[in-house]
């Protein structure tokens, strides 16, 4: 009986270690951050991310992650994305369309129980390696306050 318990314990531990190692993407994600937004996200509520020092001259792929509830009443979320990754002295501003619902009104993305996560590719950038690199996000919907966005974040991949 003890031998079976030892073998079972060893198999369980090996399974846990294997699951942890398999869930990691070594070298895939260079930076990942998320920020909760207020219940009513206004244009004054800028979401600001200070990026770690990225290696100069490397190309990175940006992805914006939006987590929303069914309380969000529009099909798309429009976001102003400002960054100074390519050149820390100059800010670049882009408007990013984040589709959250299909034309039929069904939520896009993954999620359960009314909370959905949508990944929106932003593009690729070459870093200047500055320690001052930042990314800022603010909604640009016509309403002064947006309800139903629980958090928004960025991922930077090699």
Model-predicted segments: where are they?
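Bacterial signal peptide processing site
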Residues: 25-28
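Short coil-to-beta strand junction motifs in C2/discoidin
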Residues: 73-79, 148-150
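An anionic, turn-rich surface loop/hairpin at beta-sheet edges
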Residues: 96-126
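C-terminal motif of bacterial Sec signal peptides marking the signal peptidase cleavage site
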Residues: 20-23
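Noncatalytic modules at the cell exterior or secretory-pathway interfaces
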Residues: 56-64, 124-141
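Short amphipathic, basic-aromatic surface patches that mediate peripheral association
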Residues: 64-72
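Bacterial N-terminal signal peptides that target proteins for export
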Residues: 2-12
